[in-house]
Swiss-Prot record:
PANTHER family: DELTA-1-PYRROLINE-5-CARBOXYLATE SYNTHASE (PTHR11063:SF8), GLUTAMATE SEMIALDEHYDE DEHYDROGENASE (PTHR11063). GO terms for molecular function: glutamate-5-semialdehyde dehydrogenase activity; NADP binding. It catalyses: L-glutamate 5-semialdehyde + phosphate + NADP(+) = L-glutamyl 5-phosphate + NADPH + H(+). It is found in: Cytoplasm. InterPro entries: Ald_DH/histidinol_DH, Ald_DH_C, Ald_DH_N, Aldehyde_DH_dom, G-glutamylP_reductase_CS, Glu-5-SA_DH, GPR_dom. This is Gamma-glutamyl phosphate reductase. Pathway: Amino-acid biosynthesis; L-proline biosynthesis; L-glutamate 5-semialdehyde from L-glutamate: step 2/2.
Amino acid sequence: MNALNIAEYTHTLGLQAKTASAQMARAPAAIKNKALLALARLLRQNVDALQGDNARDLERARAAGLAEPMVDRLKLTPKVLETCAQGCEQLAAMPDIIGEIQGMKQQPSGIRVGQMRVPIGVFGMIYESRPNVTIEAASLSIKSGNACILRGGSEAIDSNKALARLVAQALAEAGLPEHGVQLVQTTDRAAVGQLIAMPQYVDVIIPRGGKGLIERISAEAKVPVIKHLDGNCHTYVDDPCDIVMAVQVADNAKTQKYSPCNASEGLLVARGVAAQFLPQIGAVYAAKGVEMRGCPEALAILRAVPGVQLAEATEADWSEEYLAPIISVKVVAGVDEAIAHINRYGSHHTDAILTRDHMHAQQFLRDVDSASVMVNASTRFADGFEYGLGAEIGISTDKFHARGPVGIEGLTSLKWVVLGEGEVRT
């Protein structure tokens, strides 16, 4: 497509989405749930075909020299597809919050005032790699009564098109508008520039991907943006703590999967437990091939661990999202220094403390400036599915409108409802 055709194409998508949004907003819960259950069924029925489409994307990615952690994000394994199907079913089983009125109160004037939860309208989703985001975004759009326009990465175009066809089929089966969920079919980047500059059609943009994508969208968008930025997450091992538990959690937070944004990239260890904890976690990481980039104090302890891969951490390491079997390690004086380090170098995504001290736990929860803060749990739990939200559309590192995993509620807003019996203002 040339520039003119792309502009016409994206405006057509926008107009179609805006038109469909009215019907999506009015759809009864039973109809929306019917579409979600149909989508879950279609995903399970088409696993082999979807993996065939996905294989073409994987082949192109490897031929283009894409790093293996990025290739991993492209994979539509049977497990990934089953998780998507379960997410659709979980959403269908959840109460429909659209139209709920909350906080209704009688005022001295006689009127009653409350707020009704309503869909945002139309959201645009721009994302890289993970094709399962197509299903997560589509299913949340359906449940929340919104229309959406999805623009996935060029590296996953075949997978995204195949998934979008199943979404369209599910919408049709339920009697919902075919344009309720639309995928941008071109890989031309000019389409992104058009999509983020159509406030007459699109109410909010949700970018999900690398820092470059997020910064570009934030700078150029002419509509509000809900950002899903870096995942430089930390696990802090406190003094006192349960060492056995701390080793298990720190292991899971880093190695359960390297590519997600909620994997821990930094390990902070209180000086009082460092000599006991670091050799044990070092042995675990050594067995799994994880490189530990440490401060001098951490390295002095870790050098005694057989087979461990060590490097001296640089200033850049404290801010790095590795998405790989690498973790930064720093010994700190205690909870105060850990919190200061996280707030300075972290990405305000998810951070955890492993501790037996209730006051330290409360201080950490209060003072760490992140979307999710955890006590004695793996950062890998920072996920809409694990939080009981069904699917998630992303994990917002913003502070306004939505923060943390963005589920149904994050795709809605509140409007004021006033009920009277002829009252007039005096």
